[in-house]
Amino acid sequence: MEESELTQNETEELKASVSAVEFIHIAQRDLEQCLFADSLVTVSDSGRELGDFSVSVTKASYNEELCYLLHANSHGTIDDVPCGTSIVAYISRKLEILEENHHEYVKLEKKTVDRKIHIVRQDDQLVVDRVISEREGVKTQTLKFPLSSLDGFVSEASNFLLLRIMARQKIVPENMTFLSLDADSGLSKSVYKALGWQKQMVGEDLVDIFGIERTIYSANLSSATWHCFFMPDGHLASRVQLGSPAVMKLLHLPFLLDGVIKTFFFLVEKDKIPVMEKKPLIWEEDMELYSKFLDRKEELKADYSSYLRQHPELKALLADFLQFLLLRKPQDVFSFARDFFAPFASQSPPGKSQEF
């Protein structure tokens, strides 16, 4: 394993702007308004559907600290190449990354490139573990960044929350330069700029959308730029990386239900969970035994529901695993599952809620 540690001297020339550091100290009420799900479709220049994209933010807890759980997911086939990205992260109320898992894959004709990145705060450092699997073998690397040099740091996960906040405020202040990681996990600058207003067809409706540009300037790689457009309430309407042959678009307007914005989220729908029919047994005719059975059943359901509420990442983890499994359709499911979870099994998490 390759390991490197960046000292303060090595990172001091990379700093977020004062306005960016001030902006990141966001009022709690602004963050609370960004807790919803977006679901978009990935389409080609000709309008052909290539895949799907979703991102959701919910309340959660991490090592007994109230925080937010973000799950972003993108899967599809671009230029006849299956590919996908999944991000699961715990984000503090100060937009600090507590822990983040980032998984990307590209399934080429003769090989599959698989990249997993795990980010976690440990003591006074941000630790980044990289595992890249290719046909030639597995490469691992650990990077450590002192937290004292990361004021104004925004990861891929916290970027989604930051964009929603800017979109709801309908303004991007001048000189919004944050710190971020490039594709090789090198510390880089991430610059946000307003693109102004334009119109977009969503279903049968013509809506006004506000655009934000994000560019990551890397010292060793070419810069990468994304254009994201949002509806006035912060819902994502379109997203594209410049140079990519695909764009993500919102096909249907979110709808209002009981005063809460709801969107269709494609991962797991609780109403579609199969229910096993109960086989009649003789003991059911005994009122006392049947009453005890119902009491125990409700007790277990409450216990399971409590566990799921305490670990919302379980839904995201299982959904990701099933999607990767169905996309690749391996002959040996057990080996595939072992390889999928192996990079995370060797991690040494500092808190209770970070095992994905």
Swiss-Prot record:
Deletion consequences: Morpholino knockdown of the protein causes curved body, a lack of defined brain structures or necrosis in the developing brain, and eye formation defects at 24 hpf. At 48 hpf, show a reduction in number of ciliated cells within the olfactory organ.
Tissue distribution of the protein: Expressed in tissues rich in motile cilia.
Cellular compartment(s): Nucleus; Cytoplasm; Cell membrane; Cytoplasm, Cytoskeleton
InterPro entries: CATIP_N, DD_CATIP
Example of a GO biological process term: determination of heart left/right asymmetry
Keywords: Cell membrane, Cilium biogenesis/degradation, Cytoplasm, Cytoskeleton, Membrane, Nucleus
Any GO CC annotation of this UniProt entry: nucleus
Primary location recorded for the protein, binned into one broad class: nucleus
A Pfam match: CATIP_N
Role played: Plays a role in primary ciliogenesis by modulating actin polymerization.
Protein family: Belongs to the CATIP family.
PANTHER family in the record: CILIOGENESIS-ASSOCIATED TTC17-INTERACTING PROTEIN, RIIA DOMAIN-CONTAINING PROTEIN 1
Name of the protein: Ciliogenesis-associated TTC17-interacting protein
Gene name of the record: catip
